A protein has these predicted regions:
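Sec-dependent N-terminal signal peptides of Gram-positive bacterial secreted proteins and lipoproteins
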Residues: 19-40
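Substrate-binding groove of N-acetylhexosamine-processing glycoside hydrolases
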Residues: 312-316, 320-326, 331-332, 362-526
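Low-complexity, acidic Ser/Thr/Pro-rich repeat tracts that form intrinsically disordered stalk/linker regions
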Residues: 2-7, 40-160
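Aromatic- and acidic-residue-enriched carbohydrate-binding clefts of CAZyme catalytic domains
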Residues: 161-163, 204-260, 277-310, 341-366
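An active-site-proximal structural segment forming one wall of the substrate-binding cleft
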Residues: 252-273, 302-334
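Amphipathic, non-membrane alpha-helical rod segments
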Residues: 534-588
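Conserved small/polar residues in nucleotide/adenosyl-binding loops
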Residues: 590-592
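Catalytic domains of carbohydrate-active enzymes, especially glycoside hydrolases
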Residues: 181-204
Length: 592
């Protein structure tokens, strides 16, 4: 942080570094033995009113001890001016957000674009208002629109909700999870009606290794065994997990196939340019000099220096390697992009990247934010070249709602986890939709950090997550600016900020169950018990009376004729049919 006696502090407020990471939007609806109907998730869904989502304040805030310099004062004033100018455009907000066609907006990013100012504003998550888009949509309706029968309309709404992605995210980058543990999570995901497992394999640690890890970059090829040793050591330097270092390629392939058989998709994450401690350590082992971002003498342990061409080239080649493996196995690949150098900048990383525009030649990264946009778009291009959909966390995308630096690839699905906090001024979900991005709601109101199992045990504790789920529905997208935000699904997340903390399956499953129960209309009903009940009907009915056989057959027929697109909110329909079948079988045994 110190260089030549100059200390940068971008605001007067205390800065907090909130950890999250989480991610994805899926592939498959939960399968069911009976024939399923095809449903669509493309429509806009009005969001109900909900309580305001509380923004995170970590349990161990890092207060700045540095005095405020004149340069920071000017930066804050410039930010305030920007806010006042932007407020004028919010008066005529349309409640239902649709992507805009940008004709004269920011240029496609190049290495010569111009940065933008930092804003300082307190952001709290705003919750969508239900049904407010209805009046605006009616303008385009025919004079005598066709009206669906009520039952058909309800069925359509149910199918649209069931088509949304329901994802559970596991931080298997910081902490090692065994294949058996992950399969158990997949089983529970199937049982509760989820569609996908979001698996962070690269998040601070890197805990997934391919058979061939050779990397070609910087005019040379790094041998596979050398890369493996370097990454394994890099992960152990981050946290030497006694339970294991990484998953192998065969284990991952088996896991993907296991999930597919259950109707569950898998969404991998390899995070960069931040949260890549192990990769940075590995690069140094392989002879790449100074790969870490350095902020006025303070080195980030987890973030790559975007000005280090060798380090950036190696990272891109590594992402390309993993994307090639996941091609045709998964649908979405999360490239991360969150929290740039928060550890070295006191959570001011994005502001630091944008600062050079206003204070050139003062040591800030030259065109730093333009380089970040170019980097993000390069990763998106790499992922798309393998037939995958890129996804990334929201905080760095159009930071400070500034679009003058360049344009992010619209194909990047935005995992919207935060509305920001004091001095961490992220773009609204409304703006991101207008810029053409799909939104996966990853609201941090639903977060749980392993080991923080009750109130009083730190931010993102389990009680906080459970209460957040109860009070914040799946439709409540962070920082909506009063608009109804179209979203492709929701993701609940379990993080391992303290990787040594014990993993408790029962606590994770409690979180997953609460998310499903609180949003029951969006989750598929559990048909497994119905299938089991049918399988338990005696095969030989010759010993039973004709009346008993008829009763059993009729009860079984009711189960087989059940609508295969029932939601978890309609689980009683299935359970009652099962109870009647079991009762019929029991009475048959009595009458033998």
């Amino acid at each position: 942080m110190y260089q030549g006696g100059f200390i940068m502090k971008l605001d007067k407020k205390q800065r907090f570094s909130i950890r999250k990471y989480a991610v994805g939007a899926t592939s498959v609806l939960i399968g069911f033995t009976f024939s399923a109907q095809v449903v669509s998730a493309d429509g806009l869904t009005p969001a109900p009113k909900a309580t305001e989502t509380l923004q995170a304040v970590p349990d161990s805030p890092q207060a700045s001890e540095a005095p405020i310099q004149d340069k920071e004062e000017k930066l804050v004033k410039q930010a305030d001016k920007t806010i006042k100018e932007e407020v004028k455009t919010e008066k005529d907000t349309v409640n239902t957000v649709v992507p805009k066609t940008d004709n004269a907006v920011a240029p496609v990013v190049t290495e010569h674009a111009s940065p933008a100012p930092t804003t300082e504003s307190e952001n709290t998550t705003q919750v969508e208002k239900s049904g407010e888009s209805a009046n605006t949509e009616k303008k385009n309706e025919p004079a005598t629109p066709a009206v669906l029968a009520p039952t058909t309309e309800r069925a359509t709404q149910t199918n649209e909700k069931l088509a949304k992605k329901k994802i559970v995210s596991i931080d298997a980058g910081r902490k090692y999870f065994s294949p058996e543990q992950l399969k158990e999570i997949i089983d529970k995901a199937k049982h509760y009606g989820y569609t996908d497992l979001h698996l962070l394999v690269g998040n601070d640690g890197l805990r997934f290794m391919l058979d061939d890890m050779s990397i070609t970059a910087n005019g040379k090829t790094y041998a596979s065994d050398d890369v493996k040793r370097a990454i394994e050591k890099g992960t152990n330097d981050y946290y030497n997990d006694p339970n294991g270092n990484h998953l192998t390629e065969s284990q991952m392939t088996d896991l993907i196939n296991y999930a597919k058989d259950k109707g569950i998709g898998l969404i991998p994450t390899v995070n960069s340019p931040g949260h890549m401690d192990a990769i940075l350590n590995a690069m140094k082992e392989l002879g790449i000099q100074n790969p870490n971002f350095n902020y006025f003498g303070k080195e980030s342990a987890r973030t790559v220096d975007l000005d280090n061409e060798q380090a950036v080239a190696f990272t891109k080649a590594l992402i390309d390697k993993y994307a090639a493996y996941f091609a045709k196995k998964t649908e979405i690949f999360n490239i991360g992009l969150d929290e740039y150098a928060n550890d070295a900048t006191n959570a001011k990383g994005w502001s630091v990247l944008q600062a050079d525009k206003y204070y050139p030649n003062e040591g800030y990264p030259v065109k730093g934010y333009e380089k970040f946009i170019a980097y993000a778009n390069d990763l998106a291009r790499i992922v798309k070249s393998h037939g995958l959909k890129p996804m990334a966390f929201n905080d760095g995308i159009y930071y400070n709602s500034d679009t003058s630096f360049g344009t992010f690839d619209k194909d990047i699905i935005v995992s919207m986890w935060t509305g920001g906090w004091g001095g961490y001024d992220v773009a609204s979900s409304k703006l991101l939709v207008e810029k053409g991005h799909q939104i996966l709601n990853t609201n941090d109101a639903w977060y749980y950090v392993l080991g923080r199992n009750a109130d009083g045990q730190g931010w993102y504790n389990l009680d906080q997550g459970l209460n957040g789920i109860k009070n914040t529905p799946i439709t409540s997208v962070p920082k909506s600016d009063g608009a109804t935000i179209p979203f492709i699904g929701g993701m609940v997340a379990a993080w391992a900020d303290t990787p040594s903390a014990r993993y408790s399956p029962s606590r994770l499953f409690k979180l997953m169950r609460q998310f499903a129960n609180s949003n029951a209309e969006y989750f598929a009903a559990d048909y497994e018990s119905a299938e089991q009940a049918l399988n338990e009907v005696p095969k030989d009915l010759n010993r039973y009376t004709a009346e008993s056989v008829a009763a059993v057959n009729e009860a079984a027929k009711v189960i087989r004729s059940l609508d295969s697109n029932l939601s978890r909110a309609q689980q009683d329909t299935i359970d009652q049919a099962i109870a009647k079948l079991q009762e019929a079988v029991s009475l048959s045994l009595i009458h033998i």
